[in-house]
Amino acid sequence: MRAVRLHAKWDPRPEFKLGPKDIEGKLTWLGSKVWRYPEVRVEEVPEPRIEKPTEIIIKVKACGICGSDVHMAQTDEEGYILYPGLTGFPVTLGHEFSGVVVEAGPEAINRRTNKRFEIGEPVCAEEMLWCGHCRPCAEGFPNHCENLNELGFNVDGAFAEYVKVDAKYAWSLRELEGVYEGDRLFLAGSLVEPTSVAYNAVIVRGGGIRPGDNVVILGGGPIGLAAVAILKHAGASKVILSEPSEVRRNLAKELGADHVIDPTKENFVEAVLDYTNGLGAKLFLEATGVPQLVWPQIEEVIWRARGINATVAIVARADAKIPLTGEVFQVRRAQIVGSQGHSGHGTFPRVISLMASGMDMTKIISKTVSMEEIPEYIKRLQTDKSLVKVTMLNE
């Protein structure tokens, strides 16, 4: 079968030390410290086969390009990949996907029915392949699994004709049938994963909101835009998005944003205070990936606003120092939380239900492409911000 594969050279930086979970020449939890000169290309690879009774084979229908895919293929001036996390190459990329079950092991249980997965069942899947038995998993934190693997990062992913996953990571999309027809069902299904990342950030880690609260989202990428839709559906009074791209600001309005800010032309602090009548926001989402640039403005809003007890949730991956002023968070009773992943807490089924109830995330898909075009668009998305989500659509 055909698949989009990433190859890179294992060439650790001088200061890198092999960690306890790293495997020399194969796998690291610090990708940007090790992998150099990435190449992305379409190749022929063997079709996956069921090896455990709990596994399913999925015929991939749709798979979106994530910023992580872009950063695994993008390099700094020394040729090292930008993505800082868990990676093991070569690997088939792709983790924002949906498809249909074409084979199911005898113990592959569908959590929607508590019965074996049906052949032809439309599904999506988590990319965080948690073990379920380490201490973080046992305490209910699968996104921080000590034995974590990740689909499309160190386990072969879904920019392919077929992908194999354990049934415990798969979620039925039957609820979307009748709401989305034809390819749109699978396009919507491919957006469950990134939308769940946003849900985990603003609802699970950020603590959610009370209806009537104000929220501010910095960064109008897919995660930021998903947060706009989720928080508006959760009852936010004023959803404010800050984003330089006009295309993305307009999409935010379509998804429910009450106000949008162009930070290159407007004073972010004054705009937020004006839109909220001086109260500020209960929740801020940092989704820009450049926290060192936006943090001073977030702090100033928190300091000057009449409202207290704000939460700042950091969701964008960035190996950057934040210029934090502790006094601001002490006096204004504010807090910072980090957010990683999308697993646990019933996040996937809740996102699917939101989509079934009318939260249409397919609006963010700028273009559908073939598998052969994926390497080109992974490269193009390094610089082209007019495209929000590019999604592979298989026949």
Swiss-Prot record:
InterPro entries: ADH-like_C, ADH-like_N, ADH_Zn_CS, GroES-like_sf, NAD(P)-bd_dom_sf, PKS_ER, Scyllo-inosose_DH. Its cofactor is Zn(2+). It holds the Pfam family ADH_N. Its EC number is 1.1.1.-. The keyword NAD applies. NAD(+) binds at residues 223, 243, 248. The active site is at 68 (charge relay system), 71 (charge relay system). GO terms for molecular function: oxidoreductase activity; zinc ion binding. Zn(2+) 2 binds at residues 131, 134, 137, 145. Zn(2+) 1 binds at residues 66, 95-96, 193. Keywords: Metal-binding, NAD, Oxidoreductase, Zinc. Pathway: Polyol metabolism; myo-inositol metabolism. Binds 2 Zn(2+) ions per subunit. Gene3D superfamilies: Medium-chain alcohol dehydrogenases, catalytic domain (3.90.180.10), NAD(P)-binding Rossmann-like Domain (3.40.50.720). Homodimer. Belongs to the zinc-containing alcohol dehydrogenase family. This is Scyllo-inosose 3-dehydrogenase. It comes from Thermotoga maritima (strain ATCC 43589 / DSM 3109 / JCM 10099 / NBRC 100826 / MSB8). The lineage of its organism: Bacteria, Thermotogati, Thermotogota, Thermotogae, Thermotogales. The gene is iolM.
